[in-house]
Regions:
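Extracytoplasmic loop-helix module adjacent to an early transmembrane segment
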Residues: 8-50, 62-65
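Membrane-interface alpha helices of multi-pass inner-membrane proteins
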Residues: 147-162, 173, 194-203
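Short hydrophobic alpha-helices at membrane interfaces in multi-pass membrane enzymes
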Residues: 100-105, 139-155, 188
């Protein structure tokens, strides 16, 4: 038992010092932009209206920045929830009733993948990781406390990226029925909570829709963001810069 706690503690410490000891680069352009928006670097006022992040979470970060901008709240919360998901998944593997070889193979895989995620963070990765952590809490849960924890972790995942949180459940939900099959007790144990998680997703989507369609300014920003995404996702977008520097280029 002491060995398991030592490994869990060592894992948490390892991933806690990575962002302190190494240069971290966000793997997507969205996250640095969200840091500027929530901190007020763009407009001078912290804003929680973010395109792909849940409005509740965005408002919470903006509130923290309104208290002080001397703390990098966006990154700090990111790594807090990142370490939380690692701790949950690692603990589930360590305490699982499986062969030691499979257990340490799983831990090695967790170490490898999460080291990359720690050095090159992205909110979509974190949403999926938190979703997997909620599945770990849900799998063979023994009491309602674990179910509540699983629901809370999943809701946090939807605030980072809604579809990033849903995807692991779409893929891995059949795993819950490997032991007992699709029995009535199994359906009650896993399908009912999954339906509740879908309700949480609907709440996230609904609150975001209301927030992001309630002001004309946000409507105009969505038009701008749609054009930005089109340019960023266009494989020929590099020619746009050539066209700017050389107006003679017409065939884009």
């Amino acid at each position: 038992m002491k060995k398991k706690h030592f490994i869990l503690l060592l894992t948490i410490i390892l991933f806690a010092i990575i962002p302190v000891c190494f240069n971290i680069f966000w793997s997507a352009a969205d996250d640095p932009r969200y840091i500027f928006m929530t901190s007020g670097a763009y407009t001078g006022t912290p804003s929680g209206s973010l395109m792909y992040v849940g409005s509740l979470y965005g408002s919470f970060i903006a509130f923290l920045y309104s208290i002080t901008v001397n703390i990098e709240w966006y990154s700090l919360l990111y790594y807090f929830f990142f370490i939380l998901s690692i701790a949950i998944i690692t603990k589930k593997i360590l305490w699982a009733n499986i062969k030691a070889e499979i257990k340490y193979l799983g831990l090695s895989l967790i170490l490898f993948t999460h080291t990359y995620m720690a050095l090159s963070p992205q909110s979509t990765f974190l949403a999926a990781d938190l979703s997997i952590a909620s599945m770990a809490l849900l799998y063979r849960y023994k009491n309602r406390i674990n179910l509540i924890y699983a629901a809370l972790v999943f809701f946090i995942a939807t605030q980072f990226r809604l579809f990033g949180a849903l995807m692991p459940y779409f893929i891995a939900l059949p795993i819950f029925f490997l032991n007992k099959g699709v029995s009535l007790s199994n359906v009650r144990k896993y399908i009912v909570p999954s339906c509740f998680f879908i309700l949480l997703s609907a709440i996230t989507f609904g609150s975001d829709y209301i927030r992001y369609n309630s002001t004309p300014e946000w409507h105009e920003f969505k038009k701008f963001d749609a054009a930005r995404c089109y340019i960023a996702d266009n494989p020929l977008s590099y020619k746009l810069s050539e066209h700017i520097s050389n107006p003679q280029i017409r065939n884009l």
